[in-house]
Amino acid sequence: MPRRKVVAKREILPDPKFGSERLAKFMNHLMVSGKKSVAERIVYGALDKVAERSKDEPLEIFDKALETIQPMVEVKSRRVGGATYQVPVEVRPSRRQALAMRWLVDAARSRGEKTMVQRLAGEMLDAAEGKGAAVKKREDVHRMADANKAFSHYRF
């Protein structure tokens, strides 16, 4: 057991336009080198593009995309004897959200569109519909956990 004090979680202020803490957290994931204004411009631009392309509310589509991407189970390596097993474990809610945001940003960065605004908007729309690279990543993680179900008795 560590002897240090438990560090208090920092409070994340909601974003100025929509008042959503989840969106503010996503901006922090997207931000590079502390450039928050650039991250805000990209996210708000992407949400505007989503609003143009879809009849639904852009924040609803963002939330739906994150819900679709969130993994329920993942695999963790556990060493037993001389062998390393990939043990499926349930993902706690805070990590679920963090992974979904990370995967959405990574998938958007790897897309082929010209600007990051277009890439992010496209990936959000795809994820909300249940397709795209971020959803594929989730399916791969779930498939890996399913394949290693036999080792689930090696709990953490």
UniProtKB/Swiss-Prot annotation:
GO terms for molecular function: rRNA binding; structural constituent of ribosome; tRNA binding. It holds the Pfam family Ribosomal_S7. Gene3D superfamilies: Ribosomal protein S7 domain. One of its GO terms (biological process) is translation. NCBIfam families: rpsG_bact (TIGR01029). PANTHER family: RIBOSOMAL PROTEIN S7. Belongs to the universal ribosomal protein uS7 family. This is Small ribosomal subunit protein uS7. It comes from Chromohalobacter salexigens (strain ATCC BAA-138 / DSM 3043 / CIP 106854 / NCIMB 13768 / 1H11). The lineage of its organism: Bacteria, Pseudomonadati, Pseudomonadota, Gammaproteobacteria, Oceanospirillales. The gene is rpsG.
